[in-house]
């Protein structure tokens, strides 16, 4: 990464110096603002050849700071939500219609707060560099694998939560929430998470993290962030981290956020109907 060697690129080699892009490692001009190979934003280093291309560029730093600020608010909101849920739902008392209405009201309030925070960041914060565009073959493979991968995740969900219910006897609030499926449940459990959570975790956060770390690290860090956004579903966090990573890889492979949005919505809908 510290190699600022002049690379021969043809007739213009004498006038054009290149250095490895911080993201993909391929040669990029020292004068370029965007990597021609992976679209990473680059920091001009013509004034100081000892610096690396696109090291800690101000725009990237602004996007990362906005992402961290947003998550720093989303996480406490989730923790407060979990604590209120813990004290407002008595496991010894039957989950009646009044309790269901109260819990769903709380969920919708929290989701409204989360939506305002995330949409505010998307509208007003700096944008991270876009993820590298996958090849047509990779995109086709991602769409082709959408249903098989989703089926595998649903099987993993059933197995994981069977262990929690039957072997570990862990009470799951989602069992009560999905006992009756109506428009309220579909909006709260399927629509809002599939749109808002994907916009933050698989779009903004994932691209921000790719500004400062490798692709695989960005995938798993964003997946952990996604998992802990669901503190109210504490026993499910390990599974949510796995599904978050799968959604992230599918977004990168397909080149579009639509794939994880579809997968997230269908996954939650099927799980809710099974409940």
Language-model features: locations:
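Short cysteine-rich clusters marking metal-coordination/redox-active sites
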Residues: 21-24, 35-38
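Short Cys/His-rich micro-motifs in 6-15 aa windows
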Residues: 39-50
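Alpha-helical transmembrane segments in multi-pass membrane proteins
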Residues: 65-126
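Hydrophobic alpha-helical transmembrane segments
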Residues: 67-68, 108, 143-147, 183, ...
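Functionally important transmembrane alpha-helices
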Residues: 78-83, 219-223, 229, 235-275
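Juxtamembrane helix-loop-helix connectors linking adjacent transmembrane helices
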Residues: 91-105, 127-193, 211
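Structural signal for the C-terminal ends of transmembrane alpha-helices
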Residues: 120-130, 249-253
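Membrane-interface helix/loop boundary segments of multi-pass membrane proteins
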Residues: 197-221, 249-256
């Amino acid at each position: 990464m510290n190699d600022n060697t002049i690379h021969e690129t043809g007739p213009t080699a004498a006038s054009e110096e290149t250095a490895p892009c911080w993201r993909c490692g391929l040669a990029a001009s020292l004068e370029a603002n965007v990597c021609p190979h992976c679209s990473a934003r680059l920091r001009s280093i013509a004034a100081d050849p000892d610096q690396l291309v696109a090291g800690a560029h101000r725009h990237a730093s602004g996007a990362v700071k906005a992402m961290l600020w947003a998550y720093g608010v989303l996480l406490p909101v989730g923790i407060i939500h979990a604590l209120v849920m813990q004290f407002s739902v008595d496991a010894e008392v039957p989950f009646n219609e009044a309790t269901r209405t109260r819990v769903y009201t709380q969920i919708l309030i929290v989701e409204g707060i989360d939506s305002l925070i995330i949409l505010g960041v998307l509208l007003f914060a700096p944008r991270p560099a876009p993820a590298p565009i996958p090849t047509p073959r990779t995109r086709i493979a991602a769409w082709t694998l959408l249903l098989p991968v989703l089926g595998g995740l649903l099987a993993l969900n059933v197995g994981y939560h069977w262990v929690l219910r039957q072997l570990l006897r862990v009470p799951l609030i989602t069992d009560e929430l999905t006992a009756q499926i109506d428009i309220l449940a579909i909006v709260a459990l399927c629509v809002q998470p599939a749109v808002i959570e994907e916009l933050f975790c698989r779009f903004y956060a994932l691209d921000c993290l790719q500004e400062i770390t490798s692709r695989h690290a960005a995938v798993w860090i964003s997946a952990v962030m996604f998992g802990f956004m669901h503190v109210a579903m504490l026993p499910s966090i390990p599974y949510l981290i796995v599904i978050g990573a799968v959604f992230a890889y599918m977004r990168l492979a397909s080149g579009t956020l639509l794939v994880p949005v579809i997968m997230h919505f269908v996954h939650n809908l099927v799980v809710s109907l099974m409940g």
